[in-house]
Amino acid sequence: MSMFNIIRKEFQFGQHQVVLETGRVARQANTVLVTMGGVTVLVAVVAQPKAKAGQDFFPLTVNYQEKQYAAGRIPGGYGKREGRASEAETLISRLIDRPIRPLFPEGYFNEIQITATVVSSDKTMDADIAAMLGASAALSIAGTPFRGPIGGARVGLINGEYVLNPNFEQLAQSDLDLVVAGTESAVLMVESEAKELSEDQMLGAVLFGHDEMQIAVQAIKEFAAAAGAVESTWVAPTKNETLLEQLKAAFEAKISEAYTIAVKQDRYTALDALYAEAVAQFVPENDETGIADEVNELFEDLKYRTVRDNILSGKPRIDGRDTKTVRAIDVQVGVLDRAHGSALFTRGETQALVTTTLGNTRDALMVDTLAGTKTDNFMLHYNFPAYSVGETGRESGPKRREIGHGRLARRGVQAVLPAADRFPYVIRIVSDITESNGSSSMASVCGASLSLMDAGVPLKAPVAGIAMGLVKEGERFAVLSDILGDEDHLGDMDFKVAGSANGITALQMDIKIEGITEEIMEVALNQAYAGRMHILNEMNKVISRARAEISAHAPTFEVITINPDKIRDVIGKGGATIRQITEETKAAIDIEDNGTVRVFGETKAAARAAIAKIQALTAEVEPGKIYDGKVIRIVEFGAFVNIMPGTDGLLHISQISNERVANVSDVLKEGQDVKVQVADVDNRGRIKLSMKDIEQA
C-alpha cells in the first residue's frame, strides 16, 4: 500500500500542458505541485484555525521564491545560498496576493501564509502564472472561506494577434505584456506594460485573458473536488445593528460634513474629533465588554457608507470635485542645480520630486535571474517617506509597496525611452514622494517624463499617468478620475493608466468586488484617456520635448568605429592598455565585437582625450603620409622605426638619405626621433619607410 494519496489534474492551457498534484510533497500543509510547460512550482498554504486575540486585520502573507537549483545554478555571493527576496520575487509575491486578498470575507482575520517555491525551470518562461494557479488550487483545498478559485493568464500582442501565455522569445516580439487574474465571473487584477496601445486593444487583451483562463478555473474546481476539499466552517461575526443605528443617528450628518473639508489633515482632525466624541458617548469607562472595538469598527463602516452614498447620489466628492475633474496641477522643471534632470510635479495634495541621473555602462544594474545574469540600463526607484503623509516612521530599505509602485512607474515610462544604440546612457530615475493624498505612482510617471526631458533624454513622446476609482452599489456606479487616498480606501477599484498621447504604456487594475462589467472598464478607460490628455497638456505648457543638449553636469559620450582586428591593440595584454587609458583620462570605454567604441567622460575633454589615444592605437598606416617616428632597432641593412603604437616599419639603408650611407650607425641611433614617410605597404602588411627629401627637426 502506497504511503501517498496522490491527486492529479492535467489540462491544456494555451501552448502549455499544466499538471496539478497534491498528496506527494509537504503533506503537513495544503500543498500543490504545479507544472506548467518547463516550470514547476511548489505552493504550500497554511491557514490558522483561529484568529489571534485582538486581531483587527487580515494577515495574509504571500512569499514567492526562486531556488537557483531550479535552473541548475549555484547562487553567487560569499555564502553561496539564496538571500533576501529579489525585486522580481517581491513583485510576483504581490501579483499573487492582489487577486486573492479580496476573495476572503470581511471580518476574516485568521492568519494565512502562502509560500510558492520555483523548484524547476527550463528558463523559457516566467513562473508567475504557474505560481498563481498553484496558490489558487492550494487555497481551494485548504478549507478556508476563499471565494475562488481564481485563474491567471499572461497575454501578448504579436502582429496584431493576442497570444496566450507567451514565452520569453515571444515576449521579445510582443507589443504587450499583460497579466490578468480573476474568478469565473469577474476580473480582479491586471498588471501590464505596452508599447503605446489603444484603449480598445488593452480592454480586448483583458477580456481575452479572462475568457482563456476559464479553462484553468474549471480545472482547479475539478481538482479540489477530487482532493476532497471541505467547505469552511468559519462564520462571519454579526454586526451590532442597534449600535450602528445609534451611531448613524448621532454622527452621519457630522461625518458627511467632515468629508466636505478639502484639506486632508484638517479633514482627518475633524474625523478624529468625531470619533473621540462617539467613544465618549457610547463606551463606558473601564469597559470590559469589548464595545470599544465595536464602536471603532462601526464608525469606520459609517464613514465608508457616507462617502459612497454621497458619491452615488451625485453630491460633490470629498474635495468638491465632480467625478471627472482632475485636481489642480503645478509643474516645475530644473529645480535642482546639480541633478542631470529634475522636476517637481504637484497634483492637489500629492507631490513628487523626481530626478534623472545619466551614467555610463559601468553603472548598469546586474540582475541575477533563473535564466542567467542580465544587464539593466534603466532603473526607476520610488521612495515613500513617512513625512509625505504627516507621520513619523522608521526609515529602512524599500518596502513591497514601494517596489511595486516603482515598477509600475517604470512600466509607464519605459516604452518611450530612446533605443540604446541612439542614447547609450544608463538612466536612473528616483521619485521621492514629498506629499501624498492618492495616486503617487502616477505622479511619479509624470515627474519621470518631465525630469527625463529636462535631462535632455530624447523621449519618443511625453507620458502621464492617472488613477481612477469606482464606487458601485447594485446597478448604480460612478467612475472617479484622479482619486484621493480616501477614495482609494473606500472605493471598489484602483485603476491606474499611464501613457502618451499615442496610447497606453502601462495599466494596473485592482478590483475589490465582483460584478465589474465590460461597460464599467470601458467607461474607466475612456475617462482615464480624457484625464491623461488634460495632464499632458498641463505638462506640455512647461516642457514638451527634450532639451537640445544633455545637462552640463552629465557625463558626455563619443562614439567611434575601429577595425575589429584592432580591438586587441586597444585592450592590450590582460587589459593593461585599456586600463591605462581609463586611468589617465578618467573615461569609461565600452567596446563591442563589431568595432563600435563608446567613450564616456566626465567632461568632453576627457572623452576626446581617450578617443585620441584609441585612434592612435588603431589608426591604419597611410602610404605617402609623414609620421613622427622613433628608431627602435639598428640593423646592418637599415633601421626599424616605430611610427604608431604597435606599428613599426623598415627604414632601409638606401632610404635614409639622398647621399650614400655606408654605416647606419653613423646616421641613426636607437631612441632617436625622426620624421619618416610611408613609401609602401605590401600585401602582407609590411611597411617600407623613407627619410629622403624629408626635412628633419
From Swiss-Prot:
Annotated protein name in UniProt: Polyribonucleotide nucleotidyltransferase
Positions of Mg(2+) binding: D488, D494
Major localization class: cytoplasm
**GO-annotated cellular components:** cytosol
Q: What does this protein do?
A: Involved in mRNA degradation. Catalyzes the phosphorolysis of single-stranded polyribonucleotides processively in the 3'- to 5'-direction.
Subunit relationships: Component of the RNA degradosome, which is a multiprotein complex involved in RNA processing and mRNA degradation.
Similarity field: Belongs to the polyribonucleotide nucleotidyltransferase family.
The record lists the organism as Acinetobacter baylyi (strain ATCC 33305 / BD413 / ADP1)
PANTHER family for the chain: POLYRIBONUCLEOTIDE NUCLEOTIDYLTRANSFERASE, POLYRIBONUCLEOTIDE NUCLEOTIDYLTRANSFERASE 1, MITOCHONDRIAL
Q: Which cofactor does it need?
A: Mg(2+)
What SMART domains has UniProt attached to this entry?
Answer: KH, S1
Keywords of this entry:
Cytoplasm, Magnesium, Metal-binding, Nucleotidyltransferase, RNA-binding, Transferase
Per the UniProt entry, the Enzyme Commission number(s) are: 2.7.7.8
Molecular functions per Gene Ontology: 3'-5'-RNA exonuclease activity; magnesium ion binding; polyribonucleotide nucleotidyltransferase activity; RNA binding
Gene encoding this polypeptide? pnp
Gene3D superfamilies reported for this sequence: GHMP Kinase, N-terminal domain (3.30.230.70), K Homology domain, type 1 (3.30.1370.10), Nucleic acid-binding proteins (2.40.50.140)
The S1 motif domain, residue ranges: 624-692
The record, for Pfam families, names: KH_1, PNPase, RNase_PH, RNase_PH_C, S1
Catalysed reaction(s) here are: RNA(n+1) + phosphate = RNA(n) + a ribonucleoside 5'-diphosphate
Q: Where in the cell is it found?
A: Cytoplasm
Domain KH as annotated: residue spans? 555-614
Per the record, the GO terms for biological process are: mRNA catabolic process; RNA processing
